[in-house]
Amino acid sequence: YEELCVYYLMELLILTHRLSSEKPRKSNLLTMQEMEQAVQYFSQNYNSPINIDEYAHSHNFSISWFIQSFKQYTGTTPTQYLLFLRISNAKNLLENTSFNISEISRAIGYENPLYFSRIFKKQSGLSPSEYRKKYQIIM
């Protein structure tokens, strides 16, 4: 009788371990899908005003959970990711178009070209005009 109890107890422990190790995988998969959707949304809408708090609430996420999960998934916060997208696209426009700074600023989601220039210089070390002179592809 004692051996049978030990056997059932071991079975129960093994089953509990399997179930507990499966739940994080499902949860992690769901989190990965949710974060991939956020990345896609930000990538497609970086040039529009995006409020991180509103995005989190609209997807029924707590703000802190969303920011933490996004950072685990991408290595950066949502705000930093949006900034990266905007500056990367600004660099592309500076290199490959003749758009003026105001047009580029609006194209990437900044209404104020002076604010854009300040952010751009802080991120790249060069003003948008200096960057263009240095890296523009001759057309």
Regions found by a protein language model. Name each.
Residues S58, A107-I108, Q123:
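Residues within the alpha-helical elements of helix-turn-helix
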Residues A56-I63, I67:
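Helix-turn-helix
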Residues S64, L114, S129:
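Key DNA-contact positions within bacterial/archaeal DNA-binding proteins
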Residues E36-Q40, Q44, P49, D53, ...:
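Terminal helix-turn-helix DNA-binding modules in bacterial transcription factors
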Residues L9-M10, I63, T79, L83:
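Alpha-helical structural signal
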Residues Y1-K26, Q33, Q37-Q40:
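An amphipathic alpha-helical interaction segment
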